[in-house]
Amino acid sequence: MLFPLIRHSSLRLTPVLARLPVTPNQITAVSLMFGLACAWLIMLEGWATVGGVMLVLCYVLDNCDGEIATLKNQRTEFGGHFDTFVDWIVHAAFFAALGIGVAETTGNTQWLWLGWIAAAGGAVNYLLGFILDGRDGASDAGDGPRRPEGFKDWVVYTFREMFRADFCFIVLVMAVFDLTWLLLPAGAIGAQAYWLLRLVHGAGDYHV
């Protein structure tokens, strides 16, 4: 399967990491450091491409932690919550930092607000997922992710899972062409659509 692209990288790195004395939570922590490094670099003029590379590394490790947990039979409830928390922090920091950087470069505070709106949308999605997963017992379902069936399912799956899974590559390409500022209006709108789609029945059942 071609998509998500990030899986092609993580599936090659995971066997290497599996031979090392590292735990899934340690890999998640390193992923967090790469994600925060991306946020810091994205604020600095001229460092966006390096920041994009940091985000790709963050995403690769974010996939490796779950794969390692499965291989080593080390899946835990805490690990799942930690992974979700790190995902939220990285994306919130990314959009907030991008807004700060573009606002400082242009002198226009509207970019700052777009960054904060996108970050706030990510926070709503995190809290909503935490509440809904706890209510539905999604983490204990044990049936695994289901495949989309109808048109509505595919729309939700593509937007919530496929775009999210390969978002790092979108950032990297935009950074190479100095177009990361376009992610601010897209993120400010998309982050709200993302958590609204979380309310669609069965949206939380899809995973890539």
What are these language model-derived features?
Residues 19, 70-71, 100-104:
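Transmembrane helix-loop junction
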Residues 15-22:
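Membrane interface segments of multi-pass transport proteins and intramembrane proteases
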